[in-house]
Amino acid sequence: MNKENNKEGQGDALRVIISGGGTGGHIFPAVSIANAIKELRPDAQILFVGAEGRMEMQRVPDAGYQIIGLPVAGFDRKHLWKNVAVLLKLVRSQWKARNIIRQFRPQVAVGVGGYASGPTLKMAGMMGVPTLIQEQNSYAGVTNKLLAQKARRICVAYDGMEKFFPANKIIMTGNPVRQNLLAEKPEREQAIRSFGLNPEKKTILILGGSLGARTINNTLIAGLQLIRRTTDVQFIWQTGKIYHQQVTEAVKAAGEIPNLFVTDFIKDMAAAYAAADLVISRAGAGSISEFCLLNKPVILVPSPNVAEDHQTKNALALVNKQAAIYVKDAEAENKLLPVALETIANAEKLSELSENIAHLALPDSAVVIAKEVIKLAQQS
């Protein structure tokens, strides 16, 4: 440990609240930040605040941290009348967040996005607790724009974010990723064999996020016979839990497809990335950060069902630098598989995509953010 870290390790125990979640794209960075804080300050006490019934309530304890849930829910943009109940839950969540902050007495509160970060960071700011928000996307969400008014630091992953936030608060950190992806780099052959596939064939990895992606799954279901006929290419397909039964039934009905591996959730993502010559994915900010750090050629199919269409903006930030291929969700059923097969057959294109996306990587993001958290605590 260097002198700077020794200095940061001294003094009273550091107490930090980290709030947010909802999807793996928020949870994995949050845990990475917590781990980095503990590396720098082993004495740190870290409490997570999430949303009741959401994925973080299981994943955070699995990572070794305590979490408390708020009764918060997202706004229903299609059925506005349903938001009366949502507003009541928001009031209850703010009251509960206030009590959590009073009891835990954090020196800093960190928001990583997701339902719980709004009420938690709003109450922290009102109670005089320094706050730091992490904006993962290239287009800032409404909640973070509101929280930015009282935030001391705003950690971002894209250029040009001063159009959303005060420039003097912004720090370019990139998005934290799962540390094991960088620490564990299995050999390609070993990784492919772990999925029961052939190391001599090109491999396409299909991701839809931890919950799944309807369009990507339906496109692959419609293309099962094309997949079977394309014997020189193989596929690792993560369906997400919601769509797994539908996909497995379709695959079973299609008959044996030896060049296809299907699972609801890939636990060993380091192996999946090592196996992949090309990735098909939604355009979540966390996933994009992983592709950049691992230099993975990717076809992005942004979800249309997200606030402010931020995934399309994330994708275009890469496409404009020739660092990814973009297929619209509405065009995926006709275009996605043909574009993927054309791309994986073009070694020059794969190399160009890999080289260009590597230039966008921002390593050590979690450590940079952790150091900002510690600085805020020392100033409070």
UniProtKB/Swiss-Prot annotation:
Enzyme class: transferase
Major subcellular location class: membrane
Keywords from the named record: Cell cycle, Cell division, Cell inner membrane, Cell membrane, Cell shape, Cell wall biogenesis/degradation, Glycosyltransferase, Membrane, Peptidoglycan synthesis, Transferase
Pfam families noted in UniProt: Glyco_tran_28_C, Glyco_transf_28
Listed GO CC annotations: plasma membrane
Membrane topology reported for the UniProt record: Peripheral membrane protein
InterPro entries: GlcNAc_MurG, Glyco_trans_28_C, GlycoTrans_28_N
Binding site for UDP-N-acetyl-alpha-D-glucosamine: 23-25, 137, 178, 210, 266, 311
Top-level taxon of origin: Bacteria
Entries under CDD domains matching the protein: GT28_MurG
Location within or outside the cell: Cell inner membrane
EC number: 2.4.1.227
Gene3D superfamilies: Glycogen Phosphorylase B
Biological process, per Gene Ontology: carbohydrate metabolic process; cell division; cell wall organization; lipid glycosylation; peptidoglycan biosynthetic process; regulation of cell shape
GO MF annotations, alphabetized: UDP-N-acetyl-D-glucosamine:N-acetylmuramoyl-L-alanyl-D-glutamyl-meso-2,6-diaminopimelyl-D-alanyl-D-alanine-diphosphoundecaprenol 4-beta-N-acetylglucosaminlytransferase activity; undecaprenyldiphospho-muramoylpentapeptide beta-N-acetylglucosaminyltransferase activity
Pathway(s) this gene product operates in, as recorded in its UniProt entry: Cell wall biogenesis; peptidoglycan biosynthesis
Transmembrane segments: none
Catalytic activity: di-trans,octa-cis-undecaprenyl diphospho-N-acetyl-alpha-D-muramoyl-L-alanyl-D-glutamyl-meso-2,6-diaminopimeloyl-D-alanyl-D-alanine + UDP-N-acetyl-alpha-D-glucosamine = di-trans,octa-cis-undecaprenyl diphospho-[N-acetyl-alpha-D-glucosaminyl-(1->4)]-N-acetyl-alpha-D-muramoyl-L-alanyl-D-glutamyl-meso-2,6-diaminopimeloyl-D-alanyl-D-alanine + UDP + H(+)
Stored PANTHER family: GLYCOSYLTRANSFERASE (PTHR21015:SF22), UDP-N-ACETYLGLUCOSAMINE--N-ACETYLMURAMYL-(PENTAPEPTIDE) PYROPHOSPHORYL-UNDECAPRENOL N-ACETYLGLUCOSAMINE TRANSFERASE 1 (PTHR21015)
Role according to the record: Cell wall formation. Catalyzes the transfer of a GlcNAc subunit on undecaprenyl-pyrophosphoryl-MurNAc-pentapeptide (lipid intermediate I) to form undecaprenyl-pyrophosphoryl-MurNAc-(pentapeptide)GlcNAc (lipid intermediate II).
Family the entry assigns: Belongs to the glycosyltransferase 28 family. MurG subfamily.
Protein name in the entry: UDP-N-acetylglucosamine--N-acetylmuramyl-(pentapeptide) pyrophosphoryl-undecaprenol N-acetylglucosamine transferase
Record organism: Bacteroides fragilis (strain ATCC 25285 / DSM 2151 / CCUG 4856 / JCM 11019 / LMG 10263 / NCTC 9343 / Onslow / VPI 2553 / EN-2)
Gene transcribed to yield this protein: murG
